[in-house]
Amino acid sequence: MWPQPHLPTHPHLPTHPHLPTHPHLPTHPMMSKETRQSKLAEAKEQLTDHHPQTNPSVGTAASDTKKKKINNGTNPETTTSGGCHSPEDEQKASHQHQEALRRELEAQVHTIRILTCQKTELQMALYYSQHAVKQLEGEARDLISRLHDSWKFAGELEQALSAVATQKKKADRYIEELTKERDALSLELYRNTITDEELKEKNAKLQEKLQLVESEKSEIQLNVKELKRKLERAKLLLPQQQLQAEADHLGKELQSVSAKLQAQVEENELWNRLNQQQEEKMWRQEEKIQEREEKIQEQEEKIREQEEKMRRQEEMMWEKEEKMRRQEEMMWEKEEKIRELEEKMHEQEKIREQEEKRQEEEKIREQEKRQEQEAKMWRQEEKIREQEEKIREQEKKMWRQEEKIHEQEKIREEEKRQEQEEMWRQEEKIREQEEIWRQKEKMHEQEEKIRKQEEKVWRQEEKMHDQEEKIREQEEKVWRQEEKIREQEEKMWRQEEKIREQEEMWREEEKMHEQEKIWEEEKRQEQEDKMWRQEEKIREQEEKVWRQEEKIREQEEKRQEQEEKMWKQEEKIREQEEKIREQEKIREQEEKIREQEEMMQEQEEKMGEQEEKMQEQEKMRRQEEKIREQEEKIREQKEKIREQEEKIWEQEEKIREQEEMMQEQEEKMGEQEEKMWEQEEEMQEQEEKMRRQEEKIREQEKKIREQEEKIREQEEMMQEQEEKMGEQEGKMCEQEAKMQEQEEKMRRQEEKIREQEKKIREQEEKIREQEEMMQEQEEKMWEQEEKMCEQEEKMQEQEEKMRRQEEKMREQEVRLRQQEEKMQEH
């Protein structure tokens, strides 16, 4: 056994605490040859020193032993030669044996060199692979920390989405409450308009009566003057007693008239006070309405600010999602690199296993060769006993070397154990990587959950659309109720016409009775004074009602404007959601749809203008039936427009389905464009129909003017009839019995007037209830403002959290950049 040379460590490889120190090859291959030649020369010198020619004692001893062995027949080589063996043959045999040993040593040294070179290469590869694995471990830790941050951020985003959803629900509830209040106010306004119209008609009738009473007053004054003249004449003719009686009678009549006048004055003062109080209440209501409008404007501004904040947050969310996607892409790339390194590690492990197998085979071969050499050595022991001492010394050296080799083998076994431990560590790292893979799968599952939440949001939006359709159905019900109320108004008009006919009959009868009975006329004058007072009260009430109606109309207009703003805001929100979910390829379709929406808005504006015209025409009392027909046509048009809107909604749903099937969408685009053209043609036809309706309305206005001219002609005929009634003074005696019946009718009218006063009181109570409702609404507005403040505080807290998250993301980006720079440096 020959000693193995000491292999120094490689100078270029850095020492690592985890890597074991192994023996390496020398830096230059010529050093091994020189050492080998020097050792061979020393062995030759030792052999020459121990040769039998130089040392006779050794030779004799050797010859004696050889002879004994030859005689015993133990050596097969010397038995054939007949007991003679020359020293030259021994030298040749020893020389051949040394050459064979040299060849074996050279082969072993060559294999050792190859193995050491392979070992150094493997150690280098192992070092670089371990270094790369450590870098990947650091990157994996960074990625895990980022994943945790991203999970936290996703949770915060979910909380923000839930908060936004709650805010949206609150806004929807507030909108529903406003719509309910608007409907209630519209009904009250409609009732007030009906009562106003009734009061106007009554005022017109009372004005006509006033005119008649004034004419009667003028006639009575003339009669009084004539009576005074007659009295003056009678004073001259009649005695003083009769004059005193008549004067007393006239004085009593004057006192009664003065008392009636004072009562009328007091009543007028009371009515004036009531009017002032009602005006003050109306002013207060107007101030409250203005304050509410200001609050509503402030709330709208706050809502706009919140919408802007929401838009900004959505933009930040999109940016962060893009960053998360980029980070995921980086994670995928790093995972691919890790996989490549794992494959390389597997290849290196296979190479190591192959090398170990080769080493084991070489060891087996070496053992077999050693066994053969030992057999040869045993055969040559008899011949080379002289060299036994040297060989023993060499064997001692070899034993020492073998001990060193055993120690080296132990070291190798320890190194193998360490390598196995490292392999275990690598397996643990692989397990950690598998856990990272599982975490990524969890992230994908969370993304799927987020997508499901988005689908839920879409479903909620569809529910909102269904609610809007329900609101439209409620509006249709309100329209039907209005039609019923209009039918009731028609019935009231018919009753009022009957009352007018009765009043005309009254006028004719009054003219007949005025000429016959002056005293009865005075009683009637008292009744007429009462009627005048009542008429003044009614006028004051009508003025108050008119003012209330004007204020209510202004409130309705403002509410309509607010509703339009809310609708516009909802449309903006819908457009934003559509823009977020639609892709770049559908932008052209969105532009077309927006153009259609603009056309629809223009048509709606035109319809609004037409509705205003219709409202102006509704004031014409005698054309309500024709206007109703027009309103029915307009409703049909609105229903058509709603159907078109539903078609547009259906088209939008089709567009969403087309996002998944883009190939089918390209084929259906042509069909959709054709449908759009057909819809535009239908819109043009509708515009033509609207123009025709306007022409019909103008024709109706002409007819109304003709009817007014006819009414004037009828009034002239009535005046002629009144002149003819003067000729019928002789027939008034027969109508005295009818006067009693008419007095009963007057009493009934007084009862009706009292009932009207009760109704007016009920209206005042309703106005008070409205004021209470307004106060409750103000309290609700205050509560809503407080909630809005709380929401703003929450939004500020969320913004602070978002800023902190942005700072964390920036720090992570800086770390990533530093890591990338380090990777580039390596």
UniProtKB/Swiss-Prot annotation:
Residues 53-63, 71-83 have a biased composition (Polar residues). Residues 157-822 form a coiled coil. The keyword Coiled coil applies. Residues 1-100, 297-327, 345-425, 502-534, 547-646, 658-826 are annotated as: Disordered. The keyword Coiled coil applies. Keywords: Coiled coil. InterPro entries: GOLGA6L (IPR026737). Residues 31-52, 86-100, 658-678, 686-826 have a biased composition (Basic and acidic residues). Belongs to the GOLGA6 family. This is Golgin subfamily A member 6-like protein 25. The lineage of its organism: Eukaryota, Metazoa, Chordata, Craniata, Vertebrata. The gene is GOLGA6L25.
